[in-house]
Amino acid sequence: MKKKEYHRFLGKYDGYKYGWFCAAREFLLILLIVIIIFNVFVGVSRVDGSSMEPTLQHGEIVFFNRMGADYQKGDIVFARMPSGEYYVKRIIAVEGDEVDLVDGMLYINGVAETGAYMQGTTLPQEGIVAYPYTVEEGMYFVVGDNREVSMDSRSFGALVESSIKGKLLLFQ
């Protein structure tokens, strides 16, 4: 009579007696890896509102890199605003840059900001920002692409780097 062989790798004896256990164990391992990736390295959010149109539409799902990044002008970031809410915005100025708002146009270091992503007229907002505004060390000036409806650094000033939770990787 043939002795039943235990399959160390499959976690079962000849046949399917322990096959369900092996499948469940593999599923849980994969689930654990996915949870770790999405809690440590990558974040997921949904765009709420029209402040980033035409680049991002209301309801779009975005993925962002949670690991510290070297944020640059033009980067789209996921950040916590002073109100405590989380929003997706674009960095238009970094530390040392001077932001000015003249006749509906934003100027960064004396150069008019232009880009295919911009929509609407840039108007000043009620808040603490007086122009020209110099971005302090470790801070970022963020705005929405749809300037007419966006609540952004024009009203609350530049964001400290620690309030930026990540740079967008993908959006659909």
Report each predicted region and the residues it spans.
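RNA pseudouridine synthases
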Residues: 90-100
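Protein maturation boundaries and topogenic segments
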Residues: 1-86, 154, 158-172
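Soluble extracytoplasmic domains of inner/organellar membrane proteins
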Residues: 128-172
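Short strand-turn-strand beta-turns centered on an Asx-Gly dipeptide
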Residues: 108-110
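Residue-level recognition of short, solvent-exposed, well-ordered loop/turn junctions
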Residues: 57, 72, 94, 135-136, ...
